[in-house]
């Protein structure tokens, strides 16, 4: 039984969120442990009050509620948290992005990508890297909604250190039908992933691609894969 009111929980979102995160880690990756933890909040009525707090007139309360709904993986809160992506208060918007990343799932990812033009590129890439499944990433790479959506998805692959995406990323980096910024992002992600199988493809781009930005990004990724002892000649 939870011995705390929603007001007490909302007053300490960081501390409560940390406790919940630690409990979820101990429970393991399965849904059983997660449900056991969230049920404690549901049975006490606190989870419902947290969702109601998402529409509070106080920005600090909305932000705290979003953070806690994310920490508790309250999937029924996604539709309300999505609205907070357009909140006037930047702290609330940031809390909403973080919450959706923690929640994950198709609806949360759709909400994030639906706000691709309102969230900074790198902030969205971090959220996507955290919240998206492999299936989500594959679908977004196959049919990105815009150049920025493609760039964000490609960067998320690098942030996830997703070695399974090396071949597709090399394909994007070499394919001049893709916008330059997406190709540059692919080079950067290959550098972040650090898989040596990308060295040859990056070497070709660094030497022969006609675009200076691509050459620079490929050379930087190449050097990162080679390590500090081998520097590419100018």
What are the functions of these language-model segments?
Residues 1-26:
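Acidic, Ser/Thr-rich low-complexity segments on the non-lumenal side of membrane proteins
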Residues 7, 17-21, 34, 38-54, ...:
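Amphipathic alpha-helical scaffolding segments comprising HEAT/armadillo-like alpha-solenoid repeats
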Residues 17, 34, 62, 93, ...:
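Residue-level detector of extended alpha-helical repeat arrays and alpha-solenoid scaffolds
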Residues 27-28, 69, 73, 100, ...:
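Alpha-solenoid repeat junctions
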Residues 59, 69, 183-207, 211:
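Extended alpha-helical scaffolding segments
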Residues 59-73, 88-98:
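Membrane-embedded segments
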Residues 66, 82, 96-97, 113, ...:
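Hydrophobic core positions within HEAT/HEAT-like alpha-solenoid repeats
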């Amino acid at each position: 039984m939870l011995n705390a009111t929603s007001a007490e929980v909302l007053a300490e979102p960081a501390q409560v969120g940390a406790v919940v995160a630690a409990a979820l880690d101990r429970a393991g990756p399965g849904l059983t442990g997660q449900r056991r933890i969230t049920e404690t909040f549901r049975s006490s009525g606190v989870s419902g009050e947290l969702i109601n707090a998402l529409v509070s007139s106080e920005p600090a309360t909305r932000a705290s509620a979003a953070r806690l709904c994310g920490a508790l993986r309250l999937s029924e809160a996604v539709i309300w948290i999505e609205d907070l992506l357009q909140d006037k208060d930047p702290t609330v918007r940031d809390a909403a992005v973080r919450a959706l990343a923690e929640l994950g799932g198709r609806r949360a990812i759709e909400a994030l990508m639906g706000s691709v033009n309102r969230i900074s590129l790198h902030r969205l890439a971090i959220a996507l890297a955290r919240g998206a499944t492999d299936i989500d990433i594959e679908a977004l790479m196959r049919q990105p909604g815009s150049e920025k959506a493609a760039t964000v998805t490609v960067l998320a692959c690098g942030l996830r250190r997703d070695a399974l995406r090396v071949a597709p990323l090399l394909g994007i980096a070499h394919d001049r039908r893709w916008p330059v910024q997406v190709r540059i992002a692919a080079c950067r992600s290959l550098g972040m992933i650090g898989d040596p199988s990308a060295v040859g493809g990056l070497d070709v781009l660094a030497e022969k691609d006609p675009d200076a930005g691509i050459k620079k990004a490929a050379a930087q990724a190449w050097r990162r894969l080679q390590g500090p002892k081998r520097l590419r000649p100018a």
